[in-house]
Amino acid sequence: MMLAFFNVLTLFLFINLTYSQTTKCQNRAGGGEADWAIVYKAPGQDNGKIIEANDAAAWNNGAQALSNRDQHSFAKALEHVVGDHQNAKFLAYNNAPPGVPSIKTKSNSKGVIILATNADSAAWVVHTVPGFPAAKTGYNWPVAENARGHLLICLTILESQINAIAASLLLVQPLIHYNDIPKTETAGMPYFNKLAEGKISTLPPFTSRQTIRTQSGAAPVTVHIYSKSESSKYGEHELSFICYFWSKSTFFKV
């Protein structure tokens, strides 16, 4: 009888360890999933303000300082970017990669695409913070950035949305500094595979408009992503990336 109990206990622990990966956006305190979350940190602030899908009526104070390692939305959402989990994989891009001296890039884009290898679960984090997050080295918010204003957006998505995101990112040529997403997960995503391999679009079109939706079955949010390459004749010779995001109470252009 006792042996049977321990067998059940072992199985229970294994199930929890297997399925507890974080590959979705999180609520204000990082204690539950959210379809989307946005943090705006004004210059000189530590916590910033947050609005998220579960409490979209108004902005609230952040649950913790962004430098805290836990108990706030983005610390939890990035839990398996800064730490290991066998079923959570990601691609990270940043024009100022962690631990790399100042380098010149063609893009200012910063973000992370996270997915689960054992479920149709993913998230896209877009932000403005240089040197953040550092892959697999623990949560480490760059405290020097508290003096500056920053925006962080997290969208919970299905894996099928990743290819459209990649199609837009291809044009702006982000600097990818980490990718451990297995090709078996992206076999049907030609744009993502080109992005991961560092391929550059040299043929028109040089502008892109992609549309994705968040995962919520009850109230999904539509997101339009506009991008333009340096080869585009429809503007100055620079890379640009614009994301329009709205819900009933929120509108952002990033």
Language model features by range: what are they?
Residues 2-254:
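Charged, low-complexity intrinsically disordered terminal segments
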